[in-house]
UniProtKB/Swiss-Prot annotation:
SUPFAM superfamilies: MFS general substrate transporter (SSF103473)
Designated name of the protein: Uncharacterized transporter C417.10
Database matches in InterPro entries: MFS, MFS_trans_sf
Annotated family: Belongs to the major facilitator superfamily. Allantoate permease family.
NCBIfam families: 2A0114
Topological relation to the membrane, as annotated: Multi-pass membrane protein
GO terms for cellular component: cell division site; cell tip; endoplasmic reticulum; Golgi apparatus; membrane
Subcellular location as annotated: Endoplasmic reticulum; Golgi apparatus; Membrane
GO molecular function annotation: dipeptide transmembrane transporter activity; transmembrane transporter activity
Length: 508
């Protein structure tokens, strides 16, 4: 029986086609080498779970962990929208911003995010997940409270630090989703917790509108927005610590039997729930996997428009559509409702359309139509409708989050793929605000045209990723039919990558 070493496979991932019998040498099966669920898996049989028992277990998870995830994602998005509201509530005047200075306030946040994304993800892998998320969120809340500064350099410095602290949120939630849910359940759950960005925008609009109308405040309204958001973030940090366990085997709300059922459910994912040790070979494999770079390019292209519209939406509505400050703040309500309702509807659509790349294409086409209306439509109401259509653009990012959860196997590989995707997210959001030049105000036509081009280019990446995964699944099915793949009991809990575990199939 021949064996394929990791080094050989990294040199030529397709080399497995030339082997008579495929039995991957997984090497380290010590406690450091295997998944956290491995010991539980040894005591768990392969019998099917009773459907009613499984529904009861999923309800427990949905009612305990999932609401906290949704609320945290809601509050962390408030920071992004707060900057957009603050700029029309006196931020630029108070901090004496001129030219591109406001653009840099958006770029600075994602610069910090970019710099700290990989260290944050390593910390999430190395240390207990919920406790690490708690620390990041509490520090982020304190920094947010301090954002009510009196000068521009201090504001920019805090924006960088805020980006560094927020860099743990998305990768942490991707890992949590993979820890608790089957692949068939991940798309809907990811859609819902990302949709709470929309609820964050609704809350932010209401808060900003209420503060803008008040004339007797102890300080400027834009400063109070940051302080309120910071206090909420600190509170939710401690809620995570109290409610969310580090992994299913430490879950206070599950019985011992329920914990074993979690392991049995996750067998279908062909991957485990976590390993605290960084594995260099999995990192190398990630860097040589073409899927990583297709997703990276997709992320950059998707988020150039996101970075621009997230920072400049209020200025666009006020400057080109003829609304005053209070009306502009209220326009955030329907925008948030479109995002919240649209993304949840998109999540339920995934129950009927099982090809994830098709879902990503649909939402990006809607965003492309919205960007065209924003760029080329004359009437202000048509432009506003285009802006609201852009609110469903995170649907494609949701698909990619779910793809990372379900298709990147091996804990170090999953973390690394998530990091590279989010680095692309940062790069796009760094570039986005810089496309809005002060000289182009108030229409910002070059920036709007850039949005159209980016969404159009993104549509090329989805069929490319689909084809790569479809081709590999077809090849593995052929090898299995020829009896060239040897099944390993509990292989899904040995912390194998998707290259190593040839029983693994990619979600399309």
């Amino acid at each position: 029986m021949s064996s394929i070493s990791i080094d050989e496979k990294l040199k030529d991932p397709e080399s497995v086609q030339n082997k008579e019998i495929l039995d991957v040498d997984v090497g380290d099966l010590s406690p450091k080498g295997v998944d956290a669920a491995f010991n539980y898996a040894l005591d768990v049989d392969y019998d099917e779970i009773d459907p009613e028992t499984e529904r009861r277990l999923v309800r427990k998870i949905d009612c305990t962990i999932f609401p906290v995830m949704c609320l945290v994602y809601c509050i962390q998005f408030l920071d992004k929208t707060s900057n957009s509201y603050a700029v029309i509530m006196g931020l630029k005047e108070d901090l004496k911003m001129e030219g591109q200075m406001y653009s840099w306030s958006g770029t600075a946040f994602y610069l910090g995010y970019l710099v700290f994304e990989f260290p944050a993800s390593l910390l999430l892998q190395r240390f207990p997940l919920s406790k690490t998320l708690c620390v990041f969120l509490v520090i982020w809340g304190f920094l947010l409270c301090m954002t009510s500064v009196a000068n521009y350099p201090g504001f920019i410095a805090l924006r960088v630090l805020l980006g560094m602290m927020e860099s743990a949120a998305s990768p942490g939630f991707i890992l949590l989703t993979a820890q608790w849910y089957k692949r068939s359940e991940q798309q809907l759950r990811t859609s819902v917790w990302v949709a709470f960005n929309g609820l964050g925008q609704i809350l932010g609009s209401c808060m900003a509108y209420g503060l803008a109308k008040r004339t007797s405040l102890p300080m400027r309204g834009w400063k109070l927005i940051f302080i309120i958001c910071g206090v909420l973030a600190i509170f939710l940090g401690f809620v995570i610590l109290a409610v969310v366990p580090d992994n299913p085997f430490k879950a206070w709300f599950l019985t011992e039997e329920d914990r074993k059922l979690v392991v049995k459910r996750l067998r279908a994912n062909k991957q485990g729930v976590g390993n605290n040790h960084f594995k260099l070979y999995q990192f190398k494999e990630t860097m040589l996997d073409i899927r990583t770079w297709i997703m990276f390019v997709s992320s950059v292209l998707l988020n150039i428009p996101n970075g621009g519209i997230g920072t400049f939406s209020s200025l666009l509505i006020k400057g080109t559509m003829g609304y005053d400050t209070l009306q502009t703040l209220l326009m955030g309500l329907p925008a948030g409702a479109c995002e919240f309702g649209g993304l949840i509807a998109f999540g339920f659509l995934s129950l009927f359309i099982h090809k994830r790349m098709v879902l990503a294409t649909i939402t990006t086409c809607i965003a492309l139509i919205g960007s065209c209306l924003l760029s080329f439509a004359g009437p202000p109401r048509a432009q506003l409708a285009g802006y609201y259509l852009l609110m469903v653009s995170p649907g494609a990012m949701i698909v990619m989050f779910a793809i990372i959860s379900s298709n990147a196997s091996g804990y170090t590989k999953k973390v690394t793929v998530g990091v590279i995707y989010l680095i692309g997210y940062c790069v796009g959001n760094l570039i986005g605000p810089q496309t809005f030049k002060a000289a182009d105000a108030p229409e910002y036509m070059p920036a709007k045209n850039t949005m159209v081009g980016c969404y159009a280019a993104t549509l090329v990446t989805f069929p490319a990723l689909y084809y790569v995964n479809w081709r590999e699944n077809k090849r593995r099915d052929q090898l299995a039919a020829e009896g060239k793949i040897e099944h390993r009991p509990n292989a899904e809990f040995e912390d194998l990558t998707d290259f190593e575990n040839l029983d693994f199939r990619y979600t399309l």
